Each structure stands twice: as structure tokens, then as C-alpha cells.
């Protein structure tokens, strides 16, 4: 079982029942496109009157929308890689955003603090590492990924996974790899070698 936020799904063209959405996920909630990156198409909705506009913004990014309940707790991002024939969970990054959530401005324009390794208790860290690895293996990922979680007490709740995470100098996965003592070059060489052996 993978704990996660309560969610409501919409496909383009589906009827939009705002009351049913709020009955399911409550307020505030997050409305986001299912296939977009860098937090494009994501809105935090506080009032029912803002729901339709937020859904329209999300549909501009893709044909599927997910609406999720708001979880109030520590937000972390954690990379998992397959390296030297084993699945390795990287040091987690704690996200402290000045904005209402970790949006584009917070990610790329300095409106957040990224703390690696995250300030977690041993129990929280064990739960996070176990769950991040479980998500990675459940989805049968072969390369690398970065997953987002929010803690409710000691329990991390899975928010989303990115199987093509950013790899710039400011991106979280390279920061986590560096602390783990793995260079991007070494990771990619290992991936190429493993792929060639499979062929």
C-alpha cells in the first residue's frame, strides 16, 4: 500500500461537478495537469468559485487533470537510481517554499530553500527511503527518477514521480547524487553499460 493524497480525475470533455470534486478532496486542494513538468498548469484552489478556472489552466497543459487533497506537512523530493546493479535511494531534499506551493517561481527563481539532506527524524527517513524504493520498483523503472512526498506525521504520502527529472546544476537530482558521491558522468556510464549488456 502506498499512502497518497485523495484524488479526483478528469479527462478533457468530462462534465465538471465542482461539488463532487470538493466532496471528494476538500478545500484547499491542488489542480494539476497529469503530464506537465516544472509545475506548469498547477493551481492551489482555496475557494469553490476558483475551481473551474484552475481546471481550465490545467487542461491547457494536457488532456488529463488530477485534483488532489491538500496535505499539510514537510515536503521532500527524493531521487532513486539503479547504479552498479542495485537500487539506490539518494539523500532527500526538503523543500521550504516562500510561495503558496513549490511552483515555477519557487523552483527556478529563488523563491524556495532546498535543504539536502532533509531535516527528518530517523523514523521519517526510514519510512521515506522504504516508500521511495517501493514506488520505483513497483513502476519497474530502470534508470533514475525523482519522487515528491509530503509527510503527515511520520508517514510520507506519495505525490508524484518524475522519470525525466531536471539535470541542470540547480536541479535536485544532481545535488542528491553529489552528496551520495556519484557524478552524473558515472551514473550515465553505468546506465549505458547496463543497456549494452542487455542487448
Question: What kind of feature is each model-predicted range?
Answer:
Residues 1-73:
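Active-site nucleotide/adenylate-binding loops and adjacent lid/helix of ATP-dependent enzymes
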Residues 2, 59-64, 97, 137-141, ...:
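Generic secondary-structure signature for well-ordered alpha-helical cores
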Residues 10, 36, 95-98, 110, ...:
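Active-site/binding-pocket entry motifs
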Residues 22, 52-59, 105, 129-136, ...:
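A generic alpha-helix structural signal
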Residues 39, 113-116, 169-173:
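Short small-residue beta-strand/loop micro-motif enriched in glycine and branched aliphatics
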Residues 46-127, 151, 157:
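Phosphate-binding site of ATP-dependent enzymes
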Residues 121-199:
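ATP-dependent carboxylate activation and anion-phosphoryl transfer catalytic cores
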Amino acid at each position: 500500500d502506498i499512502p497518497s493524497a485523495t484524488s479526483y480525475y478528469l479527462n478533457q470533455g468530462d462534465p465538471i461537478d465542482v461539488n463532487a470534486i470538493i466532496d471528494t478532496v476538500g478545500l484547499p486542494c491542488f489542480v494539476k495537469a497529469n503530464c506537465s513538468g516544472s509545475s506548469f498548469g498547477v493551481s492551489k484552489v482555496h475557494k469553490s468559485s476558483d475551481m473551474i478556472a484552475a481546471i481550465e489552466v490545467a487542461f491547457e497543459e494536457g488532456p488529463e487533470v488530477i485534483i488532489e487533497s491538500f496535505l499539510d506537512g514537510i515536503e521532500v523530493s527524493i531521487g532513486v537510481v539503479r547504479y552498479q546493479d542495485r537500487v539506490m535511494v539518494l539523500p532527500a531534499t526538503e523543500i521550504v517554499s516562500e510561495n503558496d506551493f513549490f511552483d515555477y517561481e519557487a523552483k527556478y527563481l529563488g523563491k524556495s530553500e532546498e535543504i539536502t539532506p532533509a531535516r527528518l527524524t530517523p523514523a521519517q527517513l526510514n519510512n521515506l527511503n522504504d516508500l521511495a524504493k517501493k514506488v520505483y520498483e513497483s513502476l519497474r523503472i530502470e534508470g533514475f527518477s525523482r519522487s515528491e512526498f509530503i509527510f503527515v506525521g511520520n508517514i510520507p504520502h506519495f505525490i508524484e514521480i518524475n522519470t525525466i527529472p531536471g539535470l541542470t546544476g540547480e536541479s535536485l537530482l544532481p545535488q542528491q547524487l553529489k552528496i551520495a558521491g556519484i557524478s552524473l558522468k558515472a551514473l550515465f556510464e553505468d546506465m549505458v553499460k547496463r543497456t549494452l549488456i542487455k542487448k
